[in-house]
A protein has these predicted regions:
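Sec-dependent signal peptide recognition
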Residues: 2-9
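C-terminal motif of bacterial Sec signal peptides marking the signal peptidase cleavage site
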Residues: 13-16
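Mature, soluble, non-transmembrane domains
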Residues: 18-34, 42, 56-58, 74, ...
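Short acidic/polar alpha-helix capping motifs at helix-coil junctions
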Residues: 34-36, 69-70
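A short, Trp-centered hydrophobic/proline-enriched beta-strand micro-motif
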Residues: 41-64
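Structural recognition of beta-strand segments within beta-rich domains
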Residues: 64-91
Length: 198
């Protein structure tokens, strides 16, 4: 087999395995069984994020067993785009999720992204990084209670809690360069270590 035919084979394999998936930005995100919210528009993002992040996740399967994942990522978020690119420890791109204008687009050459509800990942990112007031209004419009506690004015650390009928659904906390999101209702969590931004 020649080098050209080997290269052609691998290119064909990459193209054949490439998956894309797109959903409208107005698709509902159910934080409880009865209530949902729409994603906030990217224009609600008042800060700029352009940095590496380390993401570690854990979730409980329906049979009660747990599973976990971890990935390096580069996150770019501003008032026009939210983009999360996931990498392996060797720097190989696993996939990219992009939220721009009115749709969420995901693509990967190693994962079938159509099986993932990528809008939920975007929604959780918004809980961690978007301005509190915009989030509060969006959640309260749907009948949830969303609160934030900070230890002082100007302090970037926070504890954010989403609840319904007095029951906590999720908590997101930021302490220094660490963010932890725990969804008690859906039994999953993320731990994000923030890197140095541009």
């Amino acid at each position: 087999m020649t080098k050209q035919s080997i290269l052609a084979f691998f290119l064909l394999l990459l193209v054949a395995c490439h998956h894309t998936h797109q959903v409208p930005g107005t698709v509902p995100v159910y934080y409880s069984d009865d209530r949902s919210v729409s994603l906030l528009p990217t224009s609600a993002m008042t800060e700029q994020v352009d940095m590496p992040q380390r993401i570690e996740g854990k979730f409980t399967k329906t049979d009660g067993s747990t599973d976990s994942f971890e990935a390096d990522s580069w996150v770019r978020a501003n008032d026009s785009i939210l983009s999360i690119t996931l990498f392996t420890g060797f720097g190989t791109t696993l996939g990219e999720i992009t939220y721009v204008r009115d749709s969420v687009h995901a693509e990967s050459s190693v994962m079938d992204v159509a099986k993932f509800k990528t809008e939920y990942l975007i929604a959780d990112f918004q809980v961690c990084f978007y301005p509190y007031e915009s989030l509060r209004k969006n959640f309260e419009k749907a009948g949830f209670v969303f609160s934030e506690v900070r230890s002082g004015s100007g302090n970037a650390d926070y504890i954010r809690t989403l609840s319904e009928n007095g029951k906590t659904i999720l908590t997101a906390s930021k302490i220094g360069g660490e963010i932890t999101l725990v969804n008690e209702l859906r039994h999953y969590s993320y731990h994000i270590t923030l890197g140095e931004g541009k």
